């Protein structure tokens, strides 16, 4: 009996990651440094100087005639036209991909303007198209924030799934003494985790396997998404890992109300079926009724006593996203009294999604270890978690000091006060 065997098909899904603009290029470099494998990296930018330092295998200069390699000048419209000028080159680079990740920092010129164009090209070629982008810091200005909002809305129209990470929330978890460059590099690191957490599901086979077809079913035409990674150890390791995966202070959406959720549990040789089931149940409870759970498991002998839970939730309702990022009119005093950092302990030099925790609302001073259940009094089914971003609180509201003088003081001339 003769069997025909398609060698090309046996190679698995072709995954390409495109870093657009400065932020996307930095994320690509971070992925290469961290040893992300099984994907092809492409860097696309209008700035030739930035492209000269990229570690991507494929480099594309966007709009060479329009920008002459000098960048987009912070104008998304220039970035868009540059991508359209280079559409043929982009199409050739993306062609043949089963899945395309588009990663960018929104708010600038190249990433904000070119990312939606690249997403349209990828989608037209039939690739599963996923956007992983960051929203800018509030201190970068309202204009940049508005550009980011417009760019994200345009990108959402052309991708199957969109994962948004809020840079501003880094301010809530980093130590005040953290150097600026180090804090900014952590935003690139989170972009890397967003991509790697999904690609690992496809490229790393497991005992209960999740393949590209499963990922495509979960992510095709699903809109807003959440991706989280949690690592736990000890007796409550699966509970700890699942909780950390569900909630990250950097993500703008919550798992509540998601349509489909991939849960991948990775552990050492001591990983049990009960633990995999428990992780699935925790995620199921947090997502609510009607969610479709896709469970996968894999063995990594190097993990020993640890368990890693990866969660990819899609189909998050838009009204819940809007609830998280909706404008809130609050005074400077109220803002200082109500907004507390997600972590009150020091900033780890390399922030990892797996190290995030969701704290109770009683505003603890320090995160103390406990021997009790990892759940504590935490309610998986609470209505929602509101994470504020600088895109919703104006710089005046955030930093303007409240005026405490009484009217008599204001009406008294200075020379009378000094008598």
Swiss-Prot record:
Gene for this chain: ftsZ
Family: Belongs to the FtsZ family.
Domain of life: Bacteria
GO molecular function annotations of the record: GTP binding; GTPase activity
Gene Ontology cellular component list: cell division site; cytoplasm
UniProt GO BP: cell division; division septum assembly; FtsZ-dependent cytokinesis; protein polymerization
InterPro entries, A to Z: Cell_div_FtsZ, Cell_div_FtsZ_CS, FtsZ/CetZ, FtsZ_C, Tub_FtsZ_C, Tubulin/FtsZ-like_C, Tubulin/FtsZ_2-layer-sand-dom, Tubulin/FtsZ_GTPase_sf
Disordered, as annotated region: 397-419
Keywords, alphabetical: Cell cycle, Cell division, Cytoplasm, GTP-binding, Nucleotide-binding, Septation
Coiled coil stretches, renumbered: none
Binding site for GTP: 22-26, 109-111, 140, 144, 188
Subcellular location, record wording: Cytoplasm
Residues in the signal sequence: none
Reported function: Essential cell division protein that forms a contractile ring structure (Z ring) at the future cell division site. The regulation of the ring assembly controls the timing and the location of cell division. One of the functions of the FtsZ ring is to recruit other cell division proteins to the septum to produce a new cell wall between the dividing cells. Binds GTP and shows GTPase activity.
Subunit structure: Homodimer. Polymerizes to form a dynamic ring structure in a strictly GTP-dependent manner. Interacts directly with several other division proteins. Interacts with CcrZ; the interaction is direct.
UniProt induction comment: Protein level is negatively regulated by KhpA/KhpB at the transcriptional level (at protein level).
Organism of derivation: Streptococcus pneumoniae serotype 2 (strain D39 / NCTC 7466)
Pfam families per the UniProt record, alphabetical: FtsZ_C, Tubulin
Protein name from the UniProt record: Cell division protein FtsZ
């Amino acid at each position: 009996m003769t069997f025909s065997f398609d060698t090309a098909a046996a190679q698995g899904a072709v995954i390409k990651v495109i870093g657009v603009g400065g932020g996307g290029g930095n994320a690509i470099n971070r992925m290469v440094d961290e040893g992300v494998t099984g994907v092809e990296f492409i860097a696309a930018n209008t700035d030739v100087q930035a492209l000269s330092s990229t570690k991507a295998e494929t480099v594309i200069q966007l709009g060479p005639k329009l920008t002459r390699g000098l960048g987009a000048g912070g104008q998304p419209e220039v970035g868009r036209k540059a991508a359209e000028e280079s559409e043929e080159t982009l199409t050739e680079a993306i062609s043949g991909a089963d899945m395309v990740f588009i990663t960018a920092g929104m708010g600038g010129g190249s990433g904000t303007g070119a990312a939606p164009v690249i997403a349209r090209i990828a989608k037209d070629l039939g690739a599963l198209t996923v956007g992983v982008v960051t929203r800018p810091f509030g201190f970068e200005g309202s204009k940049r924030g508005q550009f980011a909002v417009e760019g994200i809305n345009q990108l959402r129209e052309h991708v199957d799934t969109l994962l948004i990470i809020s840079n501003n929330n880094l301010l809530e978890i980093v130590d005040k003494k953290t150097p600026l460059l180090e804090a900014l590099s952590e935003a690139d690191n989170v972009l890397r985790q967003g991509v790697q957490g999904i690609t690992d599901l496809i490229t790393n086979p497991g005992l209960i396997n999740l393949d590209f077809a499963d990922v495509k079913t979960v992510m095709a035409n699903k809109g807003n998404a959440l991706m989280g990674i949690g690592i736990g150890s000890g007796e409550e390791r699966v509970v700890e890992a699942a909780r950390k995966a569900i909630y990250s202070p950097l993500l703008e959406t919550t798992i509540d109300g998601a349509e489909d959720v991939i849960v991948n549990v990775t552990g050492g040789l001591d990983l049990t079926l009960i633990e995999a089931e428990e992780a699935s149940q925790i995620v199921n409870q947090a997502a609510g009724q009607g969610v479709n759970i896709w469970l996968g498991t894999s063995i990594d002998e190097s993990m020993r006593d640890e368990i890693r839970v990866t969660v990819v939730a899609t189909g998050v309702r838009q009204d819940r996203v809007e609830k998280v990022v909706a404008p809130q009119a609050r005074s400077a005093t109220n803002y200082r009294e109500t907004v507390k950092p997600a972590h009150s302990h020091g900033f780890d030099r390399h922030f990892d999604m797996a190290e995030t925790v969701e704290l109770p609302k009683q505003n603890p001073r320090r995160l103390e270890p406990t021997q009790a259940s990892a759940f504590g009094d935490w309610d998986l089914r609470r209505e929602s978690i509101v994470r504020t971003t600088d895109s919703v609180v104006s710089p005046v509201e955030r930093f303007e000091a409240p005026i405490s003088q009484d009217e008599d003081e204001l009406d008294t001339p200075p020379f009378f006060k000094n008598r």
